[in-house]
Amino acid sequence: MKISFHGQSCIKIITGDTTILVDPFISGNEKCDLKAEEQMPDFIVLSHGHDDHVGDTVEIAKNSGATVICNADLASFLAVEDGLENMAPMHIGGKRQFSFGQVKLTQAFHGSQTVRDGRIVNLGFPTGIVFTIEDKNIYFAGDTGLFSDMKLIGELNPLDVAFLPIGDNFTMGPEDAAIAARFLQAKLVVPMHYNTFPLIAQDPHKFVASLNEGIAGKVLEIGEGIEI
């Protein structure tokens, strides 16, 4: 399995002949190396409804026929407002089997709304995501602040990789993300959600260097991947 990083919180997981795209903020994202019109994933997974995470989901899903996995409120909105047909609605605490493995949604402390036709639309609770693929557990924290139940996430799902936001202002900053890494006890921690905008400018290498002894961290450059 290969996991690659594409700026902000966009990651791509390739397992066998299946491609999973997470939070595909591509258009308008100078830090992303992908082109929306070239993406043909089998699945799109969304952590929440903010525009910098839903991103190009509608265009990509319509072009590819991808199944979109997300919280049920966001799923309803995308189906009714944007005409998406292949939806897999879930909610926090639930898990579901797919052809590639299992998805479980966890809590995240953040918001989840958009503005459509001049009105503010709330799009359900933001989530984190635990993927179980090829007997590996990958935690994608989404946008969140630090919370103590991250310890429980790590206990219930021994983690091979954890993707954590470090941008501060809208999510955890580096200091809290380092605590989150200690709570989660993942084999590898990868920072995300930084340097896309001035308000979330951070040094990811400094974050990795700050991790407690025994916690491995890796900065993925745009387009770079890891094999697990």
Swiss-Prot record:
Pfam families: Lactamase_B_2. Coiled coil: none annotated. The keyword Metal-binding does not apply. Belongs to the UPF0173 family. GO terms for molecular function: hydrolase activity. This is UPF0173 metal-dependent hydrolase lmo1577. SUPFAM superfamilies: Metallo-hydrolase/oxidoreductase (SSF56281). Keywords: Hydrolase.
